[in-house]
Amino acid sequence: MPERVFSKEESYTMKKQLALVLAVAMVSASLAACGGTSTAPATTAAPAETEAPAETAAPETEAPAETEAAAAEEEIPDAASLLSDAFIDPVGDWAQYDELIAQIKAETDMAHRTELMHQAEDILMSNYAVVPIYYYNDLYMSKPYVKGVYANAFATKFFMYAEMENGSDTLRLNLASEPDFLDPALNSSVDGACLAANSFSGLYTYNAEGKPVPACAESYEVTEDGLTYTVKLKEGLKWSDGSDLTAADFEYSWKRAVDPKTAADYEYMFSGFDGYDDGEINVTAVDDTTLEFVLAAPCAYMEDLMAFPTFYPVKKEAVESYADWETTPGGWCQEAGFVSNGAFVCTGWNHDTSMTYEKNPYFWDADNVKLEKLEFMLSADDTAIYSAYNSDSVDFIDSVPTDEVAALIESQNPEFYVVDELGTYYIAFNVNSKLFEGKTPEQAACMRKAINILIDRDYIVENIGQTGQVIATSYIPLGMMDGNGGTFKDDPAVGYFDAYAINEDYDGTIAEATELLKAAGFKFGDDGKLDPSTPIDIEYLTNESSGHIAIAESLQQDLAAVGINISIGVQDWNVFLEERKNGNFDMAREGWIADFNDPINMLEMFTTTSGNNDPQYGRK
């Protein structure tokens, strides 16, 4: 990565000063991409007592009446005229989007299906409640004696085949802070998926090459029409308590995942199953080792679904042994000792501090599991995590303080890894936020569009991300397959907006944002900022992490250029997830790493009833 000319602190100072320079001196300036120095000339005040020569003095003239009238009454554009033709009301008309997603999932013509998915993204991006920032990659650090850890493109890390070349049988690591849920049906976070993948086992899993391969399944057959699957399970499958695991456990678990009482965020993953619309998916345990299920339409990514945590089995007796299991469906695994079927079993849990997982002797592939124990440090404090790594208290960490990234890259530290991921870091607006009270749907969209174009993404990826992230101009990430043998998007220059305009045409971008906000009913003062009579005050929600907080602070500076105020609320991980899910925010930091390589995964999460619909689309 090329060096930056400015330090982080200098860059922040430049951004803070820029709005002031523009206001008092009307100087044209631009923020440099990839470290270029500022070329804006210094302002020069005119001598206070110099008279203009008589022959060059402009004659006194009277402004025509038309000019006075134009100055007195500024023409404000209609908000709808500033939006895409794809725009629909994200609350009142969102049923159209829901219907489009249902059509995509039922479509058997793959070329037409791809066209429909592009239409869905057009709608999604036209209302600016989802504001893409960059396409993800992943960084982590691992001691040189740790071997065999691998990850897929969906950010799940697998430790079951890791080995320690330092003679230890224990891997000490940090992934995140206290997990929200360990019940695989209820989890919706990346760290939770990692814990689930190492303590539960589905029909399929992923190998070191990132390909889905059989796990509890021995094989499967599918009918010629692509609708009916018959899966044969491996013989002798066991739960961690030594009891038999059968096809009936999968039937129970899948039906439980779509039961409204379970309230699984990912229940819509089963929406392609026959019977889903009637509330009873078509899945049957034919016998102890045979599972049959029927789809409503062919699914090209069925193996990925069979490897996804929501499709993992849970033991009915364990789930229902919890006293309040009907009202607290995840209560059965809120403490150590719960029954699972993966490579490791949770045997110790000091909440908010540590977790211990030990090898499960009943795991179907236990002979190939070399580690005896995983010891997790639970923390979101990346400075403390990095310190623990450097003091050899942990062997593997999944986050690094923002301030340390540049030095790690420059020194080519062999313990520092950056790997590709399939996902997008973005900002979400709550479409029902008080920010938009009294505004038409079009005016609210203009507000969000103005904020979108004011964001300096180049600064974020170069100074905060620092690991080669690609600026996002669409929600669907680069490289995602289109379900028809091609890629949905493979050119970063093609997108829904010019992400570099704020750098290359600062004055023009500020003017465009101002026009959008005026169309939304806001007034501006002579200083080019919002008039106090029509303020915009935004509460921005994020979780603990130096990188997320730095991005929030960068947004704070960007939006201050037109007088928008942002207050940053930093919350613990579990509280953050709950507040965001319940729509208790104006703006929130978001990120979505694909669960499988098909755009529908990124699009169906925004249907009205989806448990991952944080922007509250379609909800009133």
Which ranges hold each PLM region?
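Aromatic-rich, solvent-exposed beta-strand/loop patch
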Residues: 160-162, 218, 225, 294-313, ...
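Ligand-site clamp/hinge motif
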Residues: 251, 361-407, 565-567, 572
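Aromatic- and charge-enriched surface segment that lines or borders ligand/interaction sites
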Residues: 218-266, 286, 292, 388, ...
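Ligand/substrate-recognition segments at binding pockets and active sites
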Residues: 65, 70-73, 80, 110, ...
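N-terminal lobe/hinge region of extracytoplasmic solute-binding protein
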Residues: 132, 140-141, 174-224, 339
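Detector for C-terminal structural segments
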Residues: 72-171, 350, 454-490, 547-556, ...
